[in-house]
Amino acid sequence: MDRNQKMDHVIGGKFKLGRKLGSGSFGELYLGINIQTGEEVAVKLEPVKTRHPQLQYESKIYMFLQGGTGVPHLKWFGVEGEYSCMVIDLLGPSLEDLFNYCKRIFSLKSVLMLADQLICRVEYMHSRGFLHRDIKPDNFLMGLGRRANQVYIIDYGLAKKYKDLQTQKHIPYRENKNLTGTARYASVNTHLGIEQSRRDDLESLGYVLMYFLRGSLPWQGLKAGTKKQKYDKISEKKMLTSVETLCKSYPSEFTSYFHYCRSLRFEDKPDYSYLRRLFRDLFIREGYQLDYVFDWTISKYPQIGSSSRPRPTPRPALDPPGPPAERAEKPTVGQDLRGRFTGAIEAFTRRNVSSQGALGDRSRHRSSDDIPSSAKEVHESRNGSTSKRGVISSTRPGSSAEPSENHSSRLFSSGSRHATTQRVPQSYESAAAARPGHEDAIRNFELLTIGSGKKRK
């Protein structure tokens, strides 16, 4: 099927393909239109004859995770001619895109608002028996419309089942495993060849948070002749960089986060509430308002930030309660890309400001374990990630990370809702999804057709 044939083709009887959003070894991603309702969707195509098919496997994981807060709706999956097709909700920009727009630095306030949701997303995946194994900024996207302030976790190409939900049996501890995921954000144990478990997703998330705060990580930009040599250099630098050095000049809660994650044993269930509480208490002590005004809003319209400035509050030296520790570059965006991306940011922000003046506050568990192990083996055998990213897909040339060892495809999930501590009147999750006022803070984001760039080293 050539390009013109694709554009004229109707998927599943009602989704017409629009412009191409991205492509790569995973297949192709298109904007789609529901010809019955006019709704815009994302359509992912994978050639039926591809060497390592994964779209059906991915769609099953997607269906299995349906019902979690922020999990996009899987609208259709099937085969049309020469392609397997998956139709899903359309999402907004990734955190890496927004990070670049904000000149590659996020404020502490934005990082803390994001951290709460990111932990929830990872917890939800874990609660359904799966590890993500490729936690990075590209794999978190903001929503659109009424879910504009909600973070979505995408890309289940490297997801792995770590326990049976019926028997609660955990996968066995193993060593001598190849690095799976993205080297920049991989946990120390992953570098050491140890089978990944829940603790590793959370350690990777910690590196993402420090990347946002610092602007970069100490092991970025290392030169090497081969991929293995580069992984070895990253591993060495990561292990030589103490948590205290990594988090120097930043609140001690980030140091506590890493110490806790690294104290977990292989099969330990993390105390996700404790980790959220670390950052929520810090948020309160800093005097921030939970208004969901992020840096990408303020960077275009500084006056919007006036309502979100921290109120002067006492800052007692608290030692947040928690469980005892059981010890055991992306290149600069090209002018053409930057222009299109900046235009999209400005367009959506302009609409939001005019619609509300100063921005206000705002922002299902299925039981089926029929993910085939054969499909898991297939996508664990893939080598190299070369996909370009549209609104939906995340790993692309020039993405925020070292190339994944295995190719990871683009799909979505998100976390469940959680009650806050007694000091917070409304949960971060419910605030992000429930306030019609500030839903416009990222509302109606123009589609970002991100082209290919150079692969980051």
From Swiss-Prot:
SUPFAM superfamilies: Protein kinase-like (PK-like). It catalyses: L-seryl-[protein] + ATP = O-phospho-L-seryl-[protein] + ADP + H(+); L-threonyl-[protein] + ATP = O-phospho-L-threonyl-[protein] + ADP + H(+). It is an enzyme of class 2 (transferase). Keywords: ATP-binding, Cytoplasm, Kinase, Nucleotide-binding, Nucleus, Serine/threonine-protein kinase, Transferase. Gene3D superfamilies: Transferase(Phosphotransferase) domain 1. Residues 305-337, 352-442 are annotated as: Disordered. One of its GO terms (molecular function) is protein serine/threonine kinase activity. ATP binds at L21, G22, S23, G24, S25, F26, G27, E28, L29, K44. Its main location: cytoplasm. Monomer. This is Casein kinase 1-like protein 11. It comes from Arabidopsis thaliana (Mouse-ear cress). The lineage of its organism: Eukaryota, Viridiplantae, Streptophyta, Embryophyta, Tracheophyta. The gene is CKL11.
